[in-house]
C-alpha cells in the first residue's frame, strides 16, 4: 500500500475573474465586508481598520495589493465582498476579497511551482498553483503578504490596547 501525500486544506476565493487560495491554517474567520473605517496616510492597498471581537484589525485590499486596478487607478468593485481574517504570526489582518467559494483538501504534490515569468511578476505573494476543476488557482504565501517594514507601518495605524494607554498615561504623571 502506497502512503498518501499529506493533504493541505485551502480556502478558495475570487478577486475579479481570478481564483486564489490560502491555507486554512492562516484563516481565522470569514466576515462580511462591512464596518471598515478609513485611516489617513496609509498605502493605497490599505483599506482601513475594523473592530472585531474587541481588537482593531487592519484591512488590506488584495485587489490593490496585487495591482488589479482599472486604467483610471480605481479598484473595480463587485459589491458585497468578504473579509478573510488572517493570522500573520503575531499580527492579524483582514484581506478584502470578492467572494469565498469553498474549502478543499489538495495533496501537497498537487501544488505546482509557478512558471518563472509568473514568479518574477507576482512571485513575492505566490506559493504555487493548483488546478480546481477547469480553473487555475493561485495559492498565496500568506506570511509574505506583508514585508517586515509593512508590519511595522501597520502597527502605527492600530491603536494600542486600552491597558497600554492607561499604563503610559500613568507613567507620564510620574515624570
Which ranges hold each PLM region?
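An acidic, low-aromatic, low-complexity terminal/linker signal
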Residues: 1-175
